[in-house]
Amino acid sequence: MARDVEAQLNYIESLISSVDAQIDAINKMVLEVQTTIQILSSDELRQSKERLISVGSGIFANGNLDLDSDLIVPIGSGVYIAEKRSETIERLKANIENLKESIQKLMDQRRTLVDQYNTVYTTEATRNIK
């Protein structure tokens, strides 16, 4: 196999690995957002008598949660807004849809890269047979 073809195949493999890592990271975000929606939708927090709030570095403090008052929600670039729990849940559901669209685009890119890899590999294999 010629060096340039081998380099091209290695490059495509690295791109596929990069796309796979991005898909994995986004899937983890989707799971985290789904968990947050479940928590916000559940009355379990209201019924819990003990609430520990992380203050960082593995340290927790006893605290109270008032889910009926506004939640402070990040909307990007270090900007936060106050909104009702129901609005936050809807925002999170929209975020999941956006993340799923991103996953689909990445899957399409991955398919294209795999097709390119197979084309380069098959073309080189055909040349070597002749």
UniProtKB/Swiss-Prot annotation:
<keyword id="KW-0963">Cytoplasm</keyword>
<comment type="subunit">
    <text>Heterohexamer of two alpha and four beta subunits.</text>
</comment>
<comment type="function">
    <text>Molecular chaperone capable of stabilizing a range of proteins. Seems to fulfill an ATP-independent, HSP70-like function in archaeal de novo protein folding.</text>
</comment>
<dbReference type="Pfam" id="PF02996">
    <property type="entry name" value="Prefoldin"/>
</dbReference>
<dbReference type="GO" id="GO:0016272">
    <property type="term" value="C:prefoldin complex"/>
</dbReference>
<dbReference type="GO" id="GO:0006457">
    <property type="term" value="P:protein folding"/>
</dbReference>
<keyword id="KW-0143">Chaperone</keyword>
<dbReference type="GO" id="GO:0051082">
    <property type="term" value="F:unfolded protein binding"/>
</dbReference>
<dbReference type="InterPro" id="IPR011599">
    <property type="entry name" value="PFD_alpha_archaea"/>
</dbReference>
<dbReference type="InterPro" id="IPR004127">
    <property type="entry name" value="Prefoldin_subunit_alpha"/>
</dbReference>
<comment type="similarity">
    <text>Belongs to the prefoldin subunit alpha family.</text>
</comment>
<protein>
    <recommendedName>
        <fullName>Prefoldin subunit alpha</fullName>
    </recommendedName>
</protein>
<dbReference type="GO" id="GO:0005737">
    <property type="term" value="C:cytoplasm"/>
</dbReference>
<dbReference type="InterPro" id="IPR009053">
    <property type="entry name" value="Prefoldin"/>
</dbReference>
